[in-house]
Amino acid sequence: MSSRRRVLLKVIILGDSGVGKTSLMNQFVNRKFSNQYKATIGADFLTKEVQIDDRIFTLQIWDTAGQERFQSLGVAFYRGADCCVLVYDVNVMKSFDNLNNWREEFLIQASPSDPENFPFVVLGNKTDVDGGKSRVVSEKKAKAWCASKGNIPYFETSAKEGFNVDAAFECITKNAFKNEPEEEPYLPDTIDVAGGQQQRSTGCEC
């Protein structure tokens, strides 16, 4: 039986404090959501294996603090990223207006080799709030901004309801992999003493 290649991808999630970065990560990795808000201190990360076609990807997803006092830590966390996810709250205009600042800061601190083609994905989160009545950022406005930045993929999500989360992270995985060098390092399958293999995959569609 041929070995499936396991590719490690580093994904950074950026955005203002309170837009739902931690909730999106926990919904995708653990299928859990908490109404209790707790600000991320510095940065934290979770990992999850995603299978797309014949490849198994290990996503290392970094959730970073949105507070300004932690932004100086960025250079240590951003370096080596394969994709950057920009998150805003569709009910808070300021969080959308700040997307450009987060994008520019990432490019400066991460210093990717090809900044013009580095993959970003934008998520407009919290679409569930008040059944959409509190929304202030239209989908049209968000897509126009993404188009102006090189046609960045855009998804509207609800971490609370799990809406579009899997589809967004499948797109994130594919874009991160495109940023990998052709001869990317890979992790071989691990086989336990009973001869079984442990695999996890998502059933998301892009």
Curated annotation (Swiss-Prot):
Which positions does the record annotate as the modified residue Cysteine methyl ester?
206
Residues bound to GTP: 15-22, 63-67, 125-128, 158-159
- What Pfam families does the database record attribute to this sequence? Ras
Taxonomically, which superkingdom?
Eukaryota
- SMART domains, alphabetized: RAB, RAN, RAS, RHO
GO cellular component, as recorded: Golgi apparatus; nucleus; plant-type vacuole; plasma membrane
Which membrane topology describes this protein? Lipid-anchor
* Major site of localization recorded for this protein: membrane
Which PROSITE patterns does UniProt cross-reference here?
Answer: RAB
Q: Which UniProt keywords apply?
A: Cell membrane, GTP-binding, Lipoprotein, Membrane, Methylation, Nucleotide-binding, Prenylation, Protein transport, Transport
Note the Gene3D superfamilies from the entry: P-loop containing nucleotide triphosphate hydrolases
Q: State the InterPro entries in the record.
A: P-loop_NTPase, Small_GTP-bd, Small_GTPase
Q: Which cysteines are joined by disulfide bonds?
A: none
Lipidated positions for S-geranylgeranyl cysteine? 204, 206
> Can you say where in the cell this protein is located?
Cell membrane
Output one GO MF annotation.
GTPase activity
GO term, biological process aspect, one: protein transport
Question: Where does the signal peptide begin and end?
Answer: none
Motif: Effector region; annotated at: 37-45
So what does this one do? Intracellular vesicle trafficking and protein transport.
Q: Which family does it belong to?
A: Belongs to the small GTPase superfamily. Rab family.
Give the protein name, as stated in the record. Answer: Ras-related protein RABG3d
Organism of derivation = Arabidopsis thaliana (Mouse-ear cress)
